[in-house]
C-alpha cells in the first residue's frame, strides 16, 4: 500500500501534470481563423501546393508540405490543432532526452509539463506556426545524441542526426544556431565519422530541393541560394532580409516590450537553468545550445522574437527542473517540485487579472486591431483568444459578396484563413500594397479597408466612411 502511494507520488502525479498541460493547449487553441503569419500559413496550406518554388529567408518547405497534406486530408480545424498534437511527440522526446542526460522519471515528466506550459511554447502550440515542429526535430536530434548506445550504434545515430538536421533546416534557419554546440561535440568526439551526417542532411532537406532547382533556373548560384536562405539579400530592396535585424543589442531598449514578452518564458525553472552553469558535461551541452538560442532571440529585432526561443526554452526546462527538483529533494521539500511547471502560468495569469481589473495599465501595440486585446493575445495564451474569428464574422455582415476587402498583413491573415475555412465567400482579399482596380468596386459591391495602419497609400486616395469595423472606401 505504501509502495503504491509512493509510486503515484513519484510517477503518477507528474504524468497527470504533463497530460493536463497538453490538454490545456487544445482547449486554448485559437481555432482555424488566426491573425498575421498564423492565418497565412493556414491559407497557404489550403492552396494544395506541397512544394515551395522558392527558398528565401521566409520559406518553410517542410512545414508547407506537412500542413498542405494535413489540410487536404482533414481540413482547417484539425490543422489548427496540429501544434497541440505535436506536444505529444515533443513530450516523448523531452522525456527520452531528460532520461538520457541522467534525470529521474519524475524529473523527466515534470520537465514535460514545465516545457509545455512555458510561455513561448504554449503560445505557439495554440497557433498555426512553424516553430513547434522545428523544436520537435531539434529536440529529437539531441535525444539521439544522448541515446541508449546499446540500442542504436554510432554510425546509425550520426546518420539519423543528419536527417533530423536536414528536416529542421527545411523549416527554419535557427537550426544551425541551436545545433551548433551538438556538431562541435560530434566533431570533437568522432572526427571524420561526422561526415555521415551529410547524406542524412541531404535526405532530410530533400523537400526543399524543388525550391533550390527553381532558384537555379532563375539564375542564382548555389552560394547565392544559401546566402539568401540564411539571411536574405540585403541589397535587394524587394527582398525581406534577416541581416538588418540580427544581433541588434543596440535596439533592445527601444524594443523593450517585445524583449519583455520573451522574458516571460523564463518565469520558472528556466531562469534557474539559464543563470546557473551546469556541472554535468551532458547538461552543459544543452545549456550552451539554450544560451546561443537566447542570445539570438533576445537580440533579433522583431516584435514576436519570443517565438524564436522555443528550442532554448525546452532545453532550459529540462535543466531547470533537474536543478530545482534535486535541490528541493535535499531539503525534504520534494513535493514543492510539483508546482514548478505552474510557476510561470500562475504569475502571468495573476498579472493579467490585475490588468483586466483596471488596476494597472500595460503597454500595447501602437496599431490596435479590432476585437483583439494585445495583452490577452500576446501575454496570456493560457486563455483562449478567438478575436480573429470575431473580426471575420463582422465582415461577413458588412461586406457583401463580390466586395473587395483591403488589409495590411496582420488582418489579411485572418481574412485569408477565414476563406480557407469557407467564410467570406465571393469576397476578394488584397494586401494594401497589392490592391488593384479598387475604383471598379466602388459603384458595385463596394471596397472596404480593415484599418488605416500601414495602408496610407490606400487611405490617402479615398474618402473613408467609418463602419463598426474598419472603413468603406468612397471616391473623393
Say what each PLM segment does.
Residues 147-151, 176-203, 277, 425:
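Perimembrane helix-loop-helix junctions
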Residues 15, 202, 279, 323-363:
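Signature aromatic-anchored transmembrane alpha helix within multi-pass, membrane-resident enzymes
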Residues 81-102, 140-144, 272-273, 319-322:
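Transmembrane-helix motifs of polytopic, lipid-linked glycan transferases
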Residues 28-43, 53-67, 77, 384-387:
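Extracytoplasmic catalytic/substrate-binding loops of multi-pass membrane glycan-assembly enzymes
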Residues 3, 258-281:
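Hydrophobic, aromatic-rich transmembrane alpha-helices
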Residues 132-133, 177, 295-329:
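Hydrophobic/aromatic-rich transmembrane helices and adjacent perimembrane loops
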Residues 57, 61, 65, 73-92, ...:
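Loop-to-helix entry region of an early transmembrane alpha helix in multi-pass inner-membrane enzymes
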Residues 36, 123-131:
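Short acidic/glycine- and proline-prone juxtamembrane loop motifs at membrane-interface regions
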